[in-house]
Amino acid sequence: PRSRTASKAIISFFVDTTGFTTKPVTLTLKKGIVATSAATFGSESYSFCVPSDITVPVVDGIATFGDVTICEGAFLTSNFVVSAENPAPPSRYILQNPNIDTSTLEVQVRETQASTSSKKYVFSDTLIEVDSSSCVYFIQEVEDQRYELIFGDGVFGKKLESLNYIDVSY
């Protein structure tokens, strides 16, 4: 099964920082909503987001953001705690929002909810070259057009540990 795909656009723009009191060395476009349609199309207006932070240098007072991919919609987050009683499968990590674009998923795993550092997990659609230390996740569609994240079992992919905290944005 294939997920829905968000409409995308590629934009470029610059920010003139010459009037700023403090002269920045870099400028960061934060992940999230960056543009909304000014006029409505039919009966709807549209919002566009960037999927991750983008930092560019400021050169001669100008920060140029070139070829920035923006996606239609709003980014959402889901969080899961790996069960202390049952850290191994069949623990289920189901994203509750239907009709998501799975290509925009970003998965981070922290040792515990209080941990400040995390490891990025990447999507895999194959077991080839996946070993016991690979930080990967798999996806399967479940009921009502929702998706479930599946993590390694310690043979194919790194196994999650009790009380690990999973951060998912999409």
What are these regions (language model features)?
Residues 1-170:
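Signature of Asx- and small-polar-rich beta-strand/turn repeats characteristic
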